[in-house]
Every structure is written in C-alpha cells, then in structure tokens.
C-alpha cells in the first residue's frame, strides 16, 4: 500500500503522522534541525532556502505556540507566509474544507500547514491533492483531532536527544490525559521508533485508551510507582475541550493524585528532565515549583520547535519541491 507521506523515491512528501515513518527519516529530521538552532543566535535570523515559496497556515483550531513557531520557522527560511483567519474566511460561511484547499491551491500555494478538530483532515487534503494532480503541494499536520501532532512529537524527540543524547538507554514516562491527546500518540510512536526501551503511561483509567498497551507501553495508575527511576517525565494537560461527560476527575482531584509536584518528581532519577507541550495548567497537571524548576526544559522545547519545523519545511519544499 502506498504511504501517502512519501513520494515514489521514498522521500518525505507530506508530514501527516509519525506512524509508518522509518527511523531513518525521523533521524534525518532531527539531524537537519540541529544547525537551524544556531540561526536563532544570529543577528540576521534568515536563510534563503524557501525564498519564493508560499506557505498557507490553515488553523481551524486555536493555537499559540504551534501557529507562531510555524510562522517564525517559515519566515526564517524566507518563505512568504499567509495565515488564514478562519473566523473571517469563507469557511465561516459554509465553504467546505476541500473547496477552501482548491481555491488556495489556485493561488499557487506550495505548502499547507493544517490544524483541524477532525481527525484525518490533513490526510484528506493530501489525498485530494494527489487525486487532482496537485501533489507537488506539501501538507504538514499541525494537529488533527485526537489523532496526531507529528511536529510536536518530533520537537519533543529533539529536546530529549539534546539533553540525554542516546534514546536506547532511557525510561520515559508520559503522564496525564493520554486518551484525548494527539501529542501522546505522536510521542509514543516516535519514542518506539527511535529505540527507547521502556515507555510508561501514567494516568487514571478514564483518561487512558482501553487498548493503550498494544502500543508497547507499560501502564501505571499510581504516579509514584510510574515515576520511579525514570529519565524523562512528559506531562500532558487535561483536554477539557475534547471531553464528553465521562466520569473524570475534577482539576483539583487530578492535581492531588496525578499532578507533578517536587515530592513526586524526586522519585525519578536526579537528572531527570520535565517536559510539557503546552499550554500548561499550573496547579492541575504540574506544580509551578516544577514548571519553573531546574529540571524543567519546557521553554527549550518551544525554542527547539522552531528549528524542527524549519527542518520539516526545508526537507519538504526546499529540497524535494524543486525536483
């Protein structure tokens, strides 16, 4: 079966999900991102790799970090960036997603960066472009429903590699609302592909998928037991906007039992790092003393996110787009 993310040469054509991508491609993205971190330290933070390319950010869900870092990344690569304001676009008047894509394609788009509440929306766009002979336009998934958030997963891998160097001797814990988290799915897929020997998932039963163990993770409902001896703690926020009346803990109950405090973090290795994809709910999934503490690498995640998104866009449109 054709992998819709790869072209006929096996090169990355779209980034829709981490699932199905070989370790070589994930490693290539991380390796490509490394020199881009240095661009931020320059007086002139510009490279000409995407000069003349038009990138459309189609965000049908709210976003701060993801949308902003995609825009910064594209501009640092010298691309022309168009941000679609969904609330004032024709989508608000009932225009279908694919009609929107068709019209923007007619404006000579080179790439769509898509965030959508519907799982599979970026796949639908990529398939439509292929079926209509416009698969030279690249699609990047910036988060689709509960399904996937591949660039977040990749920037998390870059952060781990930066601070821990080697994936193959780590124990990593993912804590919180895994059930509703597209980030967790991308994290688990990337960690497994990159050779992490033990991935732990920690949370209440009502916030974990019933089949989560088939992903090759160890499940813990006791956070203290789950954090014992880990190298990396990856926190997730409660996805209140995706919950539909399930038997769920209140924010106060969640914090008391599963919130990451300094006392709980002390059970991890002394040099463990703490990560969070944002936005953080302080006093719910993480205590401020931990979020602002010496072991937190939450702000470096944001910084590295720009470099990783530069890497993805340059690999898509900068190199292969001209073939």
Curated annotation (Swiss-Prot):
Which GO cellular component terms are attached? cytosol
Which GO terms fall under biological process for this protein?
'de novo' pyrimidine nucleobase biosynthetic process; 'de novo' UMP biosynthetic process; amino acid metabolic process
Domain of life per record: Bacteria
**Gene Ontology MF term list:** amino acid binding; aspartate carbamoyltransferase activity
The record's EC number reads: 2.1.3.2
Oligomer status and interactors = Heterododecamer (2C3:3R2) of six catalytic PyrB chains organized as two trimers (C3), and six regulatory PyrI chains organized as three dimers (R2).
Q: List the SUPFAM superfamilies.
A: Aspartate/ornithine carbamoyltransferase
> Where is L-aspartate annotated to bind?
93, 182, 237
Q: Under which pathway is this protein filed?
A: Pyrimidine metabolism; UMP biosynthesis via de novo pathway; (S)-dihydroorotate from bicarbonate: step 2/3
What family name appears in the similarity comment? Answer: Belongs to the aspartate/ornithine carbamoyltransferase superfamily. ATCase family.
Q: Where does carbamoyl phosphate bind?
A: 65-66, 115, 149, 152, 278-279
Instruction: Name the NCBIfam families on file.
Output: asp_carb_tr, PRK00856.1
UniProt catalytic activity: carbamoyl phosphate + L-aspartate = N-carbamoyl-L-aspartate + phosphate + H(+)
UniProtKB keywords: Pyrimidine biosynthesis, Transferase
Keyword Transferase (UniProt):
yes
Pfam families in alphabetical order:
OTCace (PF00185), OTCace_N (PF02729)
Question: Would you tell me the protein name for this molecule?
Answer: Aspartate carbamoyltransferase catalytic subunit
The record describes the protein's role as:
Catalyzes the condensation of carbamoyl phosphate and aspartate to form carbamoyl aspartate and inorganic phosphate, the committed step in the de novo pyrimidine nucleotide biosynthesis pathway.
Q: Identify the PANTHER family for this entry.
A: ASPARTATE CARBAMOYLTRANSFERASE, ORNITHINE CARBAMOYLTRANSFERASE, MITOCHONDRIAL
